[in-house]
Amino acid sequence: MSGELSNRFQGGKAFGLLKARQERRLAEIDREFLCDQKYSDEENLPEKLTAFKEKYMEFDLNNEGEIDLMSLKRMMEKLGVPKTHLEMKKMISEVTGGVSDTISYRDFVNMMLGKRSAVLKLVMMFEGKANESSPKPVGPPPERDIASLP
């Protein structure tokens, strides 16, 4: 009984194995894109695929290899551009062509490498800019007098 309980509560190791399996599956899909002639002229394709894989894994909350509505909601809120339920459904429909309610990794990479513009394509750009922006000031704010107030 105690062995059974300890296996059930071994979340860290199980989660690590789950993420490793997911990363292997996504790496297989990356290899398909690297071998595809359609993307042979894409600059820095291996680096882009690595970045896409990291972002996809970060927002795949249910670890099923798909970004669902709630994962997309979290992604948009993290970017500071919260969307309504209907807007997010429309985004998913645009990316998947209306075939699915979730965004698969293939759909995600096709969208990121594709020529058409989508809101999700901004994710990588905004997160990159957010990380590169100047650091926030530390310490107490400077003193102000009455004349400087609006």
Curated annotation (Swiss-Prot):
Localization per record: Cytoplasm, Cytoskeleton; Cell projection, Ruffle membrane
Ranges where the EF-hand domain occurs: 47-82, 83-117
Binding, Ca(2+): D60, N62, E64, E66
One GO CC term on file: actin filament
Annotated spans, Disordered: 129-150
Modified residue annotations for Phosphoserine: S2, S134
One BP term from GO: actin filament bundle assembly
SUPFAM superfamilies noted in UniProt: EF-hand (SSF47473)
UniProt xrefs under InterPro entries: AIF-1_EF_pair (IPR049025), AIF1/AIF1L (IPR042433), EF-hand-dom_pair (IPR011992), EF_hand_dom (IPR002048)
Keywords (A to Z) from UniProt: Acetylation, Actin-binding, Calcium, Cell membrane, Cell projection, Cytoplasm, Cytoskeleton, Membrane, Metal-binding, Phosphoprotein, Repeat
Membrane topology annotation: Peripheral membrane protein
N-acetylserine, modified sites: S2
Taxonomic superkingdom: Eukaryota
Assembly, per entry: Homodimer (Potential). Monomer.
Record function comment: Actin-binding protein that promotes actin bundling. May neither bind calcium nor depend on calcium for function.
Protein's UniProt name: Allograft inflammatory factor 1-like
Organism expressing this protein natively: Pongo abelii (Sumatran orangutan)
Lineage: Eukaryota, Metazoa, Chordata, Craniata, Vertebrata
